[in-house]
């Protein structure tokens, strides 16, 4: 996505910002290294869709019925003024949080907003292929291990798998490479609940 290379990870700097906008973050402690900057900011805004969000910012825009934070953002914008690059980013956010429009959080409004973004001539097929479906060889290997070592419980209605740190070290992957494993487990016929646990430092 355009602008991705300009993103910076907070490095503990003491800089104070006039405004801090937290997006898709349900709780203050989920901001990680950015939390000190949030607490020092002159004004704070939170845009989110998690029902667990209690509203930790000075101004909060939270819609627990929305499919994603990007859907909430779309409702705040004049869609006619949204650029193609911005539309691409918003579409990707909605697509990922809805599991490419298959999760129960997907509503008719979600689809209407996605359609409006598509009308901006965004490369929606490429976005989904490159950011949702395509995986590296190592990511496929570690998914294979998780599926191979999974087990079914409760008469096959629940499937569980575990990934240990030593396994991730063996494959040379991090927790970010584990995306999609629990979704793949959930697709098993007869399964109603999928649980994927992984060890962290």
What are these regions (language model features)?
Residues 1, 16-19, 99-201:
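Hydrophobic helix-and-loop "lid/oligomerization" segment in the mid-to-C-terminal part
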Residues 1-40:
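N-terminal small/polar loop signature for handling phosphorylated ligands or for N-terminal nucleophile
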Residues 3-6, 36-44, 64, 79, ...:
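A glycine- and small-aliphatic-rich helix-loop capping segment at beta-alpha/alpha-beta transitions
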Residues 4, 17, 41-42, 56-59, ...:
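Short, well-ordered alpha-helix to beta-strand connector turns
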Residues 8, 21, 43-47, 59-62, ...:
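Hydrophobic/aromatic beta-strand patches that form the interior of the parallel beta-sheet core
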Residues 12-15, 36-39, 53-54, 82-84, ...:
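Solvent-exposed alpha-helices and their adjacent loops that cap or buttress functional pockets
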Residues 13, 25-28, 50-52, 165-166, ...:
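Short glycine-rich anion-binding loops that position phosphate/pyrophosphate groups of nucleotides
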Residues 47-113:
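Short alpha-helices
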């Amino acid at each position: 996505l355009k602008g991705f290379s300009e993103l910076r990870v907070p490095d503990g700097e003491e800089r104070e910002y006039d405004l801090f906008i937290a997006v898709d973050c349900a709780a203050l402690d989920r901001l990680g290294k950015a939390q000190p900057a949030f607490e020092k900011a002159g004004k704070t805004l939170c845009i989110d869709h998690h029902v667990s969000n209690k509203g930790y910012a000075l101004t909060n825009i939270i819609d627990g019925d929305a499919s994603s934070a990007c859907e909430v953002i779309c409702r705040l914008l004049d869609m006619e003024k949204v650029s193609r690059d911005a539309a691409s980013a918003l579409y990707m956010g909605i697509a990922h949080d809805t599991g490419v429009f298959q999760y129960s959080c997907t509503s008719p409004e979600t689809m209407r907003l996605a359609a409006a973004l598509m009308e901006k001539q965004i490369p929606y097929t490429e976005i989904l292929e490159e950011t949702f479906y395509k995986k590296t060889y190592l990511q496929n290997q570690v998914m294979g291990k998780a599926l191979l070592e999974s087990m079914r419980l409760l008469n096959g209605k629940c499937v569980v798998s575990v990934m240990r740190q030593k396994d991730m070290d063996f494959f040379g992957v991090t927790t970010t490479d584990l995306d999609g494993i629990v979704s793949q487990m959930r697709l098993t016929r007869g399964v109603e609940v999928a649980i994927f646990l992984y060890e962290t430092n």
